[in-house]
């Protein structure tokens, strides 16, 4: 599973690069917003990425869940922190929230193996 997820992350980055070539101004602006929103500030970057995972779970965006889970892990978020955030998804999103929350936890475990 880890190889498959890493392949998907590579593909996500490739697709973003292709979109950046097709729409350089829009993607440059988007990447600037993403960088500004997720850098350390009053909240550490790891917490911001956990929030992004929670929002991706609520939106049902599987690639977003994978991407932001990998970023949370990169910023040293713990499994316990992710699980707490995912509990809020379950509270607010019911069954669909639980389904995508379980994916986020599985992605974290696989990428952290």
From Swiss-Prot:
Domain of life: Bacteria
Annotated protein name in UniProt: Uncharacterized protein H16_B0147
Disulfide bonds: none
Family the UniProt entry places it in: To H.influenzae HI_1053 and P.denitrificans COX locus Uncharacterized protein 4.
UniProt xrefs under InterPro entries: AhpD-like, AhpD_core, CMD-like
One GO MF term: peroxiredoxin activity
PANTHER family in the record: ALKYL HYDROPEROXIDE REDUCTASE AHPD, BLR3452 PROTEIN
Gene3D superfamilies found in the cross-reference section: AhpD-like
